[in-house]
Amino acid sequence: MRVDAFDFDLPSERIALRPARPRDAARMLVVDAGNIVDAGVRDLPQWLRPGDCLVFNDTRVIPAQLEGLRGEAKIGATLHKRIDLRRWQAFVRNAKRLRVGETVDFGSGVAALAEERLADGSFVLAFAGDEPVELLLERAGTMPLPPYIAGKRGADEADRDDYQTMFAREDGAVAAPTAALHFTPELLAALAAAGIATETLTLHVGAGTFLPVKADDTDDHVMHAEWGRIEADTAARLNAVRASGGRVIAVGTTSLRLLESAARDDGTITPFAGDTSIFITPGYRFKAIDGLMTNFHLPRSTLFMLVSALMGLETMQAAYAHAIAREYRFYSYGDASLLLPRQSGRSRTLS
């Protein structure tokens, strides 16, 4: 499909720079088949059924944004993907001033060697010393806010909490699974009281999630890879949910992408550990999920393509036009949407 089919105009004032407080006070646009309903995140239990299961991503965002010097040249780096204990793939700003074999001093006793430059222009950075890289980042790094926020304000101490979900426990993400930012202990208690189950998986969200689609056609876009894991007991419980008539609702596109990566053609979810570069566009045959809770996404982005695949492009265009007109808050710190497609069997294709 043409990428420009997924374009729309978003007024800049609709971009949220801070989250709702409390978190579950955010608004939620429900798209139930073709119906569009204004609601709030706290209404979520009313839109689900006893026996349904919400699936969260438990990745933890690390302070992966670094600023340093190579001699007198200022070098910025956003860590993207862990390679091993000491090496990370990173997107580098002012990359023309950095060559393979040179060292960047990030301050606070943190330095890294530019070990290799990859075909996509990113670098492999090898960190010096024996301390775990995650500890080095706590000293020298800042939270890697999305560019549409960072372009308007710098990261601050509040973001260390605001840009972390209550489920975060597995270090490795450089972007938050933002749909889960809306959840609070009180909301989880209400969901449990309504008979809604919860499960977790891990997908370490990379900085590639913010990369623009430069191709003119979706067939020509190369999707970034991210590492994920679904434990065997988690997969078994999710399969039991669907076998008993419950629905699997992914909380966030990261959870959805990993579940779909781990699913067989018959919809059975299998244990998974490895990279996924799944790219979901209209015409995709969904296998593992029955709904999605997600924030509002950028025009022309792979994530708007994903929700259009789930609900239909015309439906999502109408939903986003409604959200803009009703002044919903967009993107990572913004409001939520709950997408419930028409059910047509366990595996289905929507376009």
From Swiss-Prot:
<dbReference type="GO" id="GO:0002099">
    <property type="term" value="P:tRNA wobble guanine modification"/>
</dbReference>
<dbReference type="GO" id="GO:0051075">
    <property type="term" value="F:S-adenosylmethionine:tRNA ribosyltransferase-isomerase activity"/>
</dbReference>
<dbReference type="GO" id="GO:0008616">
    <property type="term" value="P:queuosine biosynthetic process"/>
</dbReference>
<keyword id="KW-0671">Queuosine biosynthesis</keyword>
<keyword id="KW-0808">Transferase</keyword>
<dbReference type="InterPro" id="IPR042118">
    <property type="entry name" value="QueA_dom1"/>
</dbReference>
<comment type="pathway">
    <text>tRNA modification; tRNA-queuosine biosynthesis.</text>
</comment>
<keyword id="KW-0949">S-adenosyl-L-methionine</keyword>
<comment type="similarity">
    <text>Belongs to the QueA family.</text>
</comment>
<comment type="subunit">
    <text>Monomer.</text>
</comment>
<comment type="function">
    <text>Transfers and isomerizes the ribose moiety from AdoMet to the 7-aminomethyl group of 7-deazaguanine (preQ1-tRNA) to give epoxyqueuosine (oQ-tRNA).</text>
</comment>
<protein>
    <recommendedName>
        <fullName>S-adenosylmethionine:tRNA ribosyltransferase-isomerase</fullName>
        <ecNumber>2.4.99.17</ecNumber>
    </recommendedName>
</protein>
<dbReference type="InterPro" id="IPR003699">
    <property type="entry name" value="QueA"/>
</dbReference>
<dbReference type="InterPro" id="IPR042119">
    <property type="entry name" value="QueA_dom2"/>
</dbReference>
<keyword id="KW-0963">Cytoplasm</keyword>
<dbReference type="GO" id="GO:0005737">
    <property type="term" value="C:cytoplasm"/>
</dbReference>
<dbReference type="InterPro" id="IPR036100">
    <property type="entry name" value="QueA_sf"/>
</dbReference>
<dbReference type="Pfam" id="PF02547">
    <property type="entry name" value="Queuosine_synth"/>
</dbReference>
